[in-house]
Swiss-Prot record:
EC number: 6.1.1.15
Main location: cytoplasm
GO cellular component, one term: aminoacyl-tRNA synthetase multienzyme complex
Function in brief: Catalyzes the attachment of proline to tRNA(Pro) in a two-step reaction: proline is first activated by ATP to form Pro-AMP and then transferred to the acceptor end of tRNA(Pro).
Subcellular location, record wording: Cytoplasm
Top-rank taxon: Archaea
Lineage per the UniProt record: Archaea, Methanobacteriati, Methanobacteriota, Stenosarchaea group, Methanomicrobia
Gene name of this polypeptide: proS
Single Gene Ontology MF annotation: proline-tRNA ligase activity
Family matches, as InterPro entries: aa-tRNA-synt_IIb, aa-tRNA-synth_II, aa-tRNA-synth_II/BPL/LPL, Anticodon-bd, Anticodon-bd_dom_sf, Pro-tRNA-ligase_IIa, Pro-tRNA-ligase_IIa_arc-type, Pro-tRNA_ligase_II_C
Protein name in the entry: Proline--tRNA ligase
Domain commentary: Consists of three domains: the N-terminal catalytic domain, the anticodon-binding domain and the C-terminal extension.
Catalytic activity: tRNA(Pro) + L-proline + ATP = L-prolyl-tRNA(Pro) + AMP + diphosphate
Amino acid sequence: MEEDTGALPRKENFSEWYNDILWRAEIMDVRYPVKGLYVWYPHGFGIRKRAYGVLRDLMDRDHAETMFPLLIPKTEFMKEAEHIKGFEDEVYWVTHGGRNELDVPLALRPTSETAIYPMYALWIRSHTDLPLRLYQVVNTFRYETKHTRPLIRLREITSFKEAHTVHATREEAAAQVETAIALYREFYDTLRVPVILSRRPAWDKFPGADYTIAADTIMPDGKTLQIGTVHMLGDHFSRTYAITYEDANGEQQYAYQTCYGISERSIAAVVSVHGDDKGLVLPPEVAPLEVVIVPIIVGKRRDEVLASAAALEAELRGAGFAVKLDARDMRPGAKYYHWEMRGVPLRVEVGPRDIDANTVVAVARTGKKTTLDRRGVVEGITSVLAEFGEDLSQAARQAMAARITAAETLEETAEAVKSGVAVVHWCGSQECAEKIEAAVDASIIGSDIRSDLIAVSDGPCVACGGEGTSALVARTY
């Protein structure tokens, strides 16, 4: 990769900052010659790999990973009318094999319900087959007609983790929804990204679902980014695809289902929430490199310093850290710039003075310096990284809290959504939602709010004055 030495735009100019950091920090290359399709740089893919490693570890507790085909026959795809209505304008169709027109067109999956559920109907026979919890990490395709943006709005979603579960009763499926919500909370806690959970309005739920719970974070420009969804499907799809089981009494019953997904928007959230004017700031849990060692070479002690740095690298690698010794023939300042841009959580400096004092200097990506005893360096670095991670969590929570405003009038709501999320009272009607949205140029994104940063209450609807409860209003990506 060509070395970047330019200045990153200030993060307060978020759109420009975001576009620049994707290539300066080597996350994604946007120059692929198809709109809405992008290429992961190795460094960006390393972040994705570690983040999805966390996600897979969480999923593997009680889900099994699988893989379904990319192509879906039109005959299966068109079976669930409400579901198809939500996706029909976004589907890519394969109509030819070579020069031959296909008898049945094939859809490139926009999501996999219509690929997976016909197979579930074959696999599930008895109540002893339930619950069934499977997931896959795949690419999906949607013909986005809106402005595409790397990691945020794509025509090829390269990292779609979708889970599909089947249960004997509605109550068990509803309990699985709560389990999925808890899992997503744990995932984003690990990424140090604060989220607000809420129930999407009926007109904005997943097509074919009874209801949808979504996880949103607030971006630096005040817009919300949906970074996870959990859908209660009820028995809609099981009736369409004949997913039945024999209960303990020998009777045939329709199953109940859930599905839930996360995409590379999770990486966009990490980039946007934690990054600063110097570049990426990566939580240790998702950083491809946790520690970079920079030798400070002065005078005639070059070989001694490099040997000491190499010994430190070997010790840290042996202790399980993702570590790299940067022994390139460059000024230390140029190395600092390089690794700060890429978000490495911790830089360790080793120079002649440190060797003489039997110490090393650890510099967190936040700029905080700590002198560590060389003899206890593994424990010291473990402690510094843990503190760094907690600092990221607290800073992200404080930034989110500052972007949440309670509003009692449409005027206050309009002002609040310019820089963040407004919490208003809403009666739940679509008519009032449309009035609010037209007045403030933002959307009702959810009610039944779950966040310790928001005090939920009842009060008069901001649009009609009738009985209402807390709801979120925001500009969205």
